[in-house]
Structures are given as structure tokens and as C-alpha cells.
């Protein structure tokens, strides 16, 4: 349930993260930036797709100009890519890609995204 007391285990974990977690954080940011760069390289050659580079998240928004398909999520799923359709967030003709995964997944997804964009 909900309590107004701090959990001792949580406090210890928080203290450890602030004392010794900076290297892990920096490594994670570098890793995520590499994933982002891979995705941006896959998208940059398609005039119908405009990525919005995130400032503080691992979610890449991509605006799709004049898509032939109304349901972007099902279109990308046909190519084996799980995205969120922006319509769910009030952003019609946009997709959201979560790039917080391993590099191998991003490499595979990038190729599939390119195929999906070609046929969009």
C-alpha cells in the first residue's frame, strides 16, 4: 500500500546510485546515443520522414509526410518493427520509436524501418 515513510532499501539504493552510479549513467547515455545515431542514419535518406531528435529520452519521434497508409503502426508491423502510432498521443502522421535496447536490435530494426519507409 501507500505509506508516508521512505523504504530503507530504496534509500540505500538511491544513495549508492548518487555516490557510484555516474560512470554507469555516462556509459548508458553513450550507448543510447549510438542507437539513436544508427536510427537517424537509417531515416535521413527519406524525404517523407523527419526525425525530432530527443533531448532527454530514449524515444525518437518521426513525422511522416503524406503517408499512403492511415494506420502507421500496422504498416511498420508488417516489416517487423514495433512502433507507437503518434495518433495515440495526439500527433497524427507521427511515429514513436523506443531505442532503449541492444545494438543488434537497433541494426535489425533500422533496416526494417528503411524498408517500411520506402513502401510508405
Per-region residue spans from a language model:
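PLP-dependent enzyme catalytic core of the Aspartate aminotransferase-like
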Residues: 74-84, 89-120
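Preference for bulky hydrophobic residues occupying beta-strand positions
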Residues: 43, 62, 97-99
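Conserved glycine-rich beta-strand-loop-beta hairpin in the small C-terminal domain of fold type I
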Residues: 8-11, 15, 24, 31-40, ...
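Short alpha-helical functional segments enriched in proximate histidine and acidic residues
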Residues: 39-42, 116
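Alpha-helical elements of Rossmann-like donor-binding domains used by nucleotide-donor carbohydrate transfer enzymes
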Residues: 12-16, 31, 38, 71, ...
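Residue-level recognition of strand-loop junctions within catalytic nucleotide-signaling folds
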Residues: 19, 63-65, 100-102
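Active-site PLP-lysine loop of aminotransferase-like
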Residues: 1-7, 87-88
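Acidic-histidine catalytic/liganding microenvironments
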Residues: 46
Amino acid at each position: 500500500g501507500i505509506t508516508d515513510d521512505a523504504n530503507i532499501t530504496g534509500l540505500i539504493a538511491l544513495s549508492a546510485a548518487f555516490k557510484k552510479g555516474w560512470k554507469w549513467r555516462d556509459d548508458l547515455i553513450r550507448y543510447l546515443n549510438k542507437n539513436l545515431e544508427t536510427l537517424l542514419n537509417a531515416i535521413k535518406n527519406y524525404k517523407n520522414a523527419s526525425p525530432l531528435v530527443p533531448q532527454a529520452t530514449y524515444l525518437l519521434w518521426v513525422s511522416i509526410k503524406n503517408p499512403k497508409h492511415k494506420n502507421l503502426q500496422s504498416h511498420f508491423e508488417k516489416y517487423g518493427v514495433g512502433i507507437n502510432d503518434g495518433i495515440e498521443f495526439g500527433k497524427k502522421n507521427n511515429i514513436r520509436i523506443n531505442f532503449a535496447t541492444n545494438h543488434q536490435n537497433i541494426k535489425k530494426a533500422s533496416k526494417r524501418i528503411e524498408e517500411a519507409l520506402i513502401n510508405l
